[in-house]
């Protein structure tokens, strides 16, 4: 049985390893001949764990300030310099209420059991008791590790691909398809990964699109032909049906709010009369009585009331699974043909996505012009012979800004990293915001641009919505996760960039700026378009995405 001390050492070794091969080898060597492989891998990937602990960094600080009888303000200030695990370790070492253990005695199984119990409680008094109990059997480094598991970030600079491919060279690709970690580990030991496929009622990583700024680029990407599909301005939904059971997952593989999808339980059996079990890739959009899509964000309960004659409508664009048959390895044109055979449209409720078979550049230009004239968001271009590759960016998206010569081909989904006090009438409140992106290579957040221009009502809401720490432009208080040049040090930084808001930022063009740290990339005349509530930091524009956008 693996001890927590052994696990901590593994995490430390992974962090200091120089690259993908070395990190994966460390993990592979560690798990060889161990009976608790699944537990080790599961805890190395806390971000994939579906347990919910009902506490963010600020709440953890609050609870441990009570347990340690330390100043919550002092602990929050310390958090501003680094990470939650380091703060808890520092104050655990200094506290006089609970003496840290001299030697580590916990097993990984005991830690996992604690995490399961913690996820089952919501009352603050119960959380305090559990956190006190675990601290009483921890060394300082033990508790740091436990807190980082609660925070779902071990900071080892090794994501799912590094960890899973230590089990088997193709384990990561299989996981993106099946999303079943336990099954992958069990089958890898039997050298039987090929037998794993899609499982109905278990979410699949959705296939994605990268930006495209020219018709010519599209034909280079798909020389054998493509489908041009309307890019709907709604919410991506993966529909699962198994007999009379239904499940609906967002692009983040989280359950969709019931008020958005409950109606589908009535209509899906009518649209798919022959289907016992099925998995669909689709977009749910609010449409008017003429089946014309309404604006993004109108799916909310209160927004929907503004459109009295509207309906929720499911635009179906792919079938991934049908009655026990995994269809992801079948070419798109065959999947689409099959979908036409098995689905009966229900007007304004369940319909096919609008799709055009493109054979030349002028045809694609005409289809794009038509989409933009109808005030649609743009097009998604798909290889006519392409298989469905979960989690891969194999499609292209071409949006309305494409036609504006010299303008950005696509917006960027950036994370709010900090804020500055406004001037004049906006003095004393956060009015200008520092936007940035995540650098997968360094594990740091880099700055891209500053953004302002919100109306007064929005600014009032943002004061409460954004969880910030005041640093008063003090370089010494810049958190470890942020790389920012002196000229852009903000008045406030977010408590946790991975929990911060994601904003769609558009502008005149991408430009070069030595003052910003995202490889010198910035945005000329940036403007806030909308909050991307449907995305987490993982789906935001990362640095490598930004580089690709500028190359385009």
UniProtKB/Swiss-Prot annotation:
Q: How does it assemble?
A: Interacts with host TOP2A and TOP2B.
Q: Which residues bind Mg(2+) 2?
A: 377
PROSITE patterns in the record: DNA_LIGASE_A1 (PS00697), DNA_LIGASE_A2 (PS00333), DNA_LIGASE_A3 (PS50160)
The record places the active site at: 231
Q: What is its EC number?
A: 6.5.1.1
What does induction of this protein depend on?
Answer: Expressed in the early phase of the viral replicative cycle.
A GO MF annotation of the entry reads:
DNA binding
Q: Where does Mg(2+) 1 bind?
A: 283
Residue positions annotated to bind ATP are 229, 236, 283, 382, 397
Gene source species = Vaccinia virus (strain Ankara) (VACV)
State the SUPFAM superfamilies in the record: ATP-dependent DNA ligase DNA-binding domain (SSF117018), DNA ligase/mRNA capping enzyme, catalytic domain (SSF56091), Nucleic acid-binding proteins (SSF50249)
User: Which biological process terms from the Gene Ontology are attached to this UniProt entry?
Assistant: cell division; DNA biosynthetic process; DNA recombination; double-strand break repair; lagging strand elongation
Q: Which family does it belong to?
A: Belongs to the ATP-dependent DNA ligase family.
What reaction is this protein's catalytic activity?
ATP + (deoxyribonucleotide)n-3'-hydroxyl + 5'-phospho-(deoxyribonucleotide)m = (deoxyribonucleotide)n+m + AMP + diphosphate
Compartments where found: Host cytoplasm
Q: Which UniProt keywords apply?
A: ATP-binding, Cell cycle, Cell division, DNA damage, DNA recombination, DNA repair, DNA replication, Early protein, Host cytoplasm, Ligase, Magnesium, Metal-binding, Nucleotide-binding
Q: What is this protein called?
A: DNA ligase
